Every structure is written in structure tokens, then in C-alpha cells.
Amino acid sequence: MTDTASRQAPLHAPNDALTDVAGLRVGHARLSGPGALSGTTVVLAPEGGAIAAVDVRGGGPGTRETDALDPRNLVQRIEAVVLTGGSAYGLESASGVMAWLEEQGRGVPVGREPGQVVPVVPAACVFDLGRGGDWRARPDASTGRAAVEAAARTEPGAPVEEGNVGAGTGAVVGPLKGGVGTASTVLPGGATVAALVVANAVGSAVDPDTGALYGQYFTGERPALPSPEVHTAALRRLAETYDKYGASPLNTTLAVVATDAELTRAQAQKLAGTAHDGIARAVRPVHLLNDGDTVFALATGARPLDPHPLALNAVLAAGADVVTRAIVRAVLAARTVTGPGGDFLSYQELYGTLAD
């Protein structure tokens, strides 16, 4: 494999979603009831698990079991990753996923009898406390169980719901409503690389000079720019909302980037790190002290990686690209939410058909 080959144009996979990596499933659950605007998303690996890694670059992360993914440590494969709202309180949702996996006998074998396992369930949270009006409405173990059960019910390769779902239910990006987004690509060599994000950032996804989404400049297609009149009206409405409610002090963008290529744990660690470039292209600024930006990497190992020393480059580049596209899709899929916790306007509402 040459460096030129690594730069050949990739193709979008069938669903343009994380589930295009064979064996991965995604499930969402959200809180119900008045004042609730939060939820949990679970990425379920194939039975037997996937090689996993993590890279945390935000200054205010909320995570669980990320140390287990260090390549120097014992755990080789994990069965699920949890992305959740509720800030650090919401990490309790991973307990529900852990209990479900134990019932399936899935986890690290630690006992003499079959089924005596400890499921390692890495998790990360976004800040969305109070956005529905009820500060105490946050995901718990039952929310996590509902999300993993939803993932297990899906068919292989099923489309992934985007927008105001799961951990993206109460997400915001700068002044705009955020949410869940996903994207995938097939490399010239045949490997699939995909991402799922929860876009919930302190920084903005919108170029203030044009109204285009920053990430659209990196998708290979020329952004459709709004008219100056539409953009001016959008800025005015956002300013009015800011004056009324202020800005959220804490946020986080989360991502799971995955591939069917056979990666070592060290290679997966590199993939998690370079995938952060995709966040930086789509959101400005990123990785601040009040962000908890975290990227997980999963490798199912179904497809051997070319042994050439630079073969990983194509996977690394694609990982950043699909994270950028997933953030764009999250913002475009989000819908306006109004309620006692605030008014969170969507890009779709502000810019209309331009967002289609």
C-alpha cells in the first residue's frame, strides 16, 4: 500500500452509520416525564467484544472505566460503550448495561464456572442538567438497560436514529440544539470506518461570517450558504435567546469511532487520538476546561489490515473525516426544543431548507 493509495477517495457505506461496521448495534433511551430532557445511547459490540481504546482531551471529563482501556492494562476487549446525559450522575446508566451483559454471560471471565464474568463497560457523559427544567431528571441504571436492550433488538446493519435521541436528547452546540449524528465510509482497500457522536459543545458549529456549518467545509462538498438576510435573522434570534437564558457553562462532545479492520490496542489508541481532529474541524473552540471531549475507538478485527507500516494512515484519516461528518449530521438532524429549561433553537429552524 502506498501513501497515494491511502489518499484515494473513500465511499459512503450503505447506511452512512456506525452500524455499517458489521456487528455493531446502537440503542437509544430517553427519560420520560415533565422536565426531563436527557437520555443514554449504547454501542453494543459483537459477542466476544471488540478491541477498544479512548482518548480524553476535554478539561472537564466525566468518564467510567477508561483506565481499563490503557494498552498497558489487562482488559483486551469490551462488550459495550455507554454515552449518556446527566453529567457525572448519568454514569450510573452504565450499571444497567453491566447487569444486562452479565445476564448474557458477556464480559471478562474471572471465575471457574461459565457466566462468572465481569463486564467492563466504559462510559462518558455530557452535561445537560436542568435543560428540561428538572435538575434531578437524569439517566440511571434503568435508562442504560433500556438503551442496551434497544440495541440488542436491532437487526444487523440497521439504520441509526439521529438528532434529539438518546444521549443527544438534551444536547446543545454553542447556541444551537445539538444531538446524535453518525457517518461511515468504505476505504479503497475495503475496510469500513464509521463514527457516532453526541454533539454537545461549548464552541459553535456555525461560521459566524457565513452561517455555514464549519464541518461542511471539510466534507468534500461545497457548503450551501444562506442569504445574508437569513443569516442576519438567525443571529438576531440566537442573540435574543442568549440574552434570555445565557449560555450553558459546561458541555462535552463524545464520539465512538469504529472500524472492521484488525487493529492492535496501540493502533486503536492512535485512532481515538486522531479522531479528535474531526471534532476540531466541526466545532470551534474545542477541548476547553469546561468541555469533556472524549473519543472511544473500537476495532472488530473482521478484516486484516495491510501489513505495510503506513497502512493505518488511511484508517486514521477516515476516522477524523467521519467524526466531522457525524457532527454536521447531528446538528442538521436536531430539532428545536422549548420548555421550562430554555429554548434551544435548531439549525433547521433558523436556516430552513438550507439544512435539508
For the regions a protein language model found, what residue spans apply to each?
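A structural signal for small-residue-enriched, beta-sheet-centric alpha/beta enzyme cores
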Residues: 2-95, 99-356
